[in-house]
Design a protein with these regions (language model features):
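A contiguous strand-loop segment
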Residues: 1-93
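Alpha/propeptide regions of enzymes that mature by internal proteolysis
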Residues: 75-77, 91-116
């Protein structure tokens, strides 16, 4: 079970635990600006905000569990197996895999309003 928490104060507090009895070889990952993110259906993005978080890194691609970008926007990937829906690829849509969502959003959004 994972827990995420956000505190609304004058400052920014965000936290999350990965409460598992086993490891996915997670590590602190820092992705600098202009590091190429290779998305499965959306090509490569090398023009994005820097971010830091916990990730499993595969082939140089950080698969973030949670992260915060340089603008202060934070995001966590939580597990909701009973309500998750995975759609087929659709033309003329942004086709983002679930494991790509955090770098996709945090790479281009400065605020929750932009992310919506």
């Amino acid at each position: 079970m994972c827990t995420a928490i956000r505190l609304t104060t004058r400052d920014h507090y965000f936290g999350r635990n990965l409460d598992l009895e086993y490891s996915y070889q997670e590590t602190v990952a820092i992705t600098p600006r202009r590091y190429p993110f290779h998305f499965r259906h959306e090509g490569t993005n090398s023009d994005h905000f820097a971010m830091i978080g916990m990730a499993f890194v595969v082939g140089g691609m950080p698969l973030y569990y949670e992260a915060t970008n340089e603008k202060g926007l934070s995001m966590a990937g939580l597990n909701f197996p009973a309500s998750a829906v995975y759609h087929d690829v659709k033309p003329d849509c942004a086709n983002i895999a679930s494991f790509e969502l955090i770098p996709y959003i945090l790479g281009q959004c400065e605020s929750v309003q932009e992310a919506k």
